[in-house]
Amino acid sequence: DKADTEEVTKVDETLRFYQIDDIKFLNGMAGCRAYASTAGFESICEAMYLGKPVLMVPAHIEQDCNAYDAMRAGAGIISDSFDLESLLRFAGRYTPNRNFTSWVRSCERRIIFELEETMNVVIDEMYMVESFV
């Protein structure tokens, strides 16, 4: 998140830190076999949308809630450590929740419908000032 650091910081042969880049992140996730995370809401939803199995290692209460919901939705498994072997075992039997993808794709239509319904209610409840003059 620091603009003045290198794009990639290599710690060793197995660990690298990358500057935050939404497009590169999503491209990387789209090409990965599985995803390990601390269970941040957005990245778990992105993994679910892309059909990627997830290992979630929550660090605080919001992440605990996200991980619990995602596990119940079939997105992945919860652990207290980044046990990548467990993730790979889970990935071998994982089936993406296509209902989630369909639901996400329908959101724009659903939101527009709800807004239009709200507008219809507001218009029906409006009155003309002339009626009171």
Explain the meaning of each model-derived region.
Residues A34-Y35, P53:
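Hydrophobic acceptor-binding patch used for acceptor engagement in glycosyltransferases
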